[in-house]
Amino acid sequence: MSKKKINIAIIGATGFTGLDLVFLLSKHPKVKIVNLCATKNIGKKITFFDKRIKKNLPKISSSKNIDWSILDLVFLSLPNGEAQKLIKKVYYKHENLRFIDLSADFRIKNPKKYKSIYKINHNAPKLQSKSIYAISEFVKNEIKQFRIIANPG
């Protein structure tokens, strides 16, 4: 079994879901948290937001400063409509990079249905067909062929 750690970024790290994700992944033996991103509080330590986190982690930074080439996986814990914009910018430039989206952006394949439910246009409709909405434990084999995983939340 490989001892190599997976390099990850968490975008939306200071929100409610993002903080829980940071807390859980900071304890994972096969994960190296490389970036913790938010739109506010740049430069602050994550422990400012959650005292449960004991591990020394990178300070909060902007997603504009990410070196995508060193990452294996990106978690997105953003408001609906935001993850699709970021994934659209990065997806084709970094072909080995995978994404786990905790918003609703890739849960619904039909752009018209997405708009009727969330009241915003989906700005990356071509990527919807390249994503899977799934609980990974139930679709272990199918999930491997996708780089965008919409996680139920």
Regions from the PLM with identified roles:
Residues 1-153:
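N-terminal Rossmann-like NAD(P) cofactor-binding subdomain of oxidoreductases
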